[in-house]
């Protein structure tokens, strides 16, 4: 077997593992939970603005908070091979709780 054929064969066998690993990382339950909360908060912010409960300025601040939290989640995941630890999740949830309370005022 030539070196080129061996390299091609190796690439074929490694591709499925990479695809599976990427899918696992993307859909990791802790990441999904945090990101679903961010998405839900953005929907709540939109609803509160429509109902006149919060101003557009307040909404902008709240969305910026959510964007920061999402950025932290991405950074944490990149440090831990595509997932976040329970400690990371706890810290992110505390931040999300604070933002959630501000939405509900």
Regions found by a protein language model. Give the residues of each.
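Classic N-terminal secretory signal peptides
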Residues: 1-20
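Immediate post-signal-peptide N-terminus of mature secreted/exported proteins
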Residues: 17-51
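Surface-exposed, polar/charged faces of alpha-helical domains
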Residues: 29-32, 47-90, 94, 98-101, ...
């Amino acid at each position: 077997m030539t070196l080129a054929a061996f390299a091609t064969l190796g690439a074929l066998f490694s591709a499925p593992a990479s695809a599976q690993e990427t899918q696992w990382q993307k859909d990791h339950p802790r990441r999904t939970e945090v990101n679903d909360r961010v998405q839900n908060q953005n929907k709540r912010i939109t609803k509160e603005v429509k109902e006149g409960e919060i101003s557009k300025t307040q909404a902008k601040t709240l969305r910026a908070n959510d964007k920061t939290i999402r950025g932290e989640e991405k950074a944490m995941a990149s440090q831990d091979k595509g997932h976040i630890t329970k400690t990371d999740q706890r810290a992110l949830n505390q931040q999300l709780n604070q933002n959630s309370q501000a939405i509900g005022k």
